[in-house]
Amino acid sequence: MANQDLIPVVVNGAAGKMGREVIKAVAQAPDLQLVGAVDHNPSLQGQDIGEVVGIAPLEVPVLADLQSVLVLATQEKIQGVMVDFTHPSGVYDNVRSAIAYGVRPVVGTTGLSEQQIQDLGDFAEKASTGCLIAPNFAIGVLLMQQAAVQACQYFDHVEIIELHHNQKADAPSGTAIKTAQMLAEMGKTFNPPAVEEKETIAGAKGGLGPGQIPIHSIRLPGLIAHQEVLFGSPGQLYTIRHDTTDRACYMPGVLLGIRKVVELKGLVYGLEKLL
């Protein structure tokens, strides 16, 4: 395959935990070409991103200015893709910038509000530019969510516990919110009160997510990403759990997102809609 037929990819947050895995995955993919690596770490500026992530040099320097790197992705025959694993505080502007340049975002950064997602969807539709926002790229997580949707038909009580490393900035996780949304869309009323409740410590029972489903967030060093969906009824407890033991598990989903987003003309929320 000639270089002009490869999908150009920019990775934003290239030196972060997820960004490093994306760089490695894109470098190994025969149909993708890394054309830009963005990271704000001042000690890495100008360094070859391949060497930064511990693989062979890729002749792609680490740069801090997203705008200038997006220009590189617009100079190729095929529309480029920006993969964003950065920070909730900046992801909205990152996605708008990419769409404005005609570069298609694949977003794993969580923390966007419903209104921000709606605004980005309107912007992408007007630009006829594909955009994928996925709370989680692990296929196992999608299977967990599907199993939870099936189970909720038979249980009236459900709560979600999500556990992440203590460097995660947002809580609850996008995956937990998405799971609660999927359950709420089933139209059931969950967790009818059994007694008059009183919290002696505010928030002890977790925050209420979509469908008034309690979500509990835990942040500890030593964790990566984990989630439990707990269903209860008299005499039984049904627990569905997913554990991430290595961030490599997200890469098949990220690569799928890159390949699919170039076919889209607007925003899609959730990787499961592309399967």
Swiss-Prot record:
It catalyses: (S)-2,3,4,5-tetrahydrodipicolinate + NAD(+) + H2O = (2S,4S)-4-hydroxy-2,3,4,5-tetrahydrodipicolinate + NADH + H(+); (S)-2,3,4,5-tetrahydrodipicolinate + NADP(+) + H2O = (2S,4S)-4-hydroxy-2,3,4,5-tetrahydrodipicolinate + NADPH + H(+). (S)-2,3,4,5-tetrahydrodipicolinate binds at H165, G174, T175. Pathway: Amino-acid biosynthesis; L-lysine biosynthesis via DAP pathway; (S)-tetrahydrodipicolinate from L-aspartate: step 4/4. The keyword Translocase does not apply. It is an enzyme of class 1 (oxidoreductase). It is found in: Cytoplasm. CDD domains: DHDPR_N (cd02274). Catalyzes the conversion of 4-hydroxy-tetrahydrodipicolinate (HTPA) to tetrahydrodipicolinate. This is 4-hydroxy-tetrahydrodipicolinate reductase.
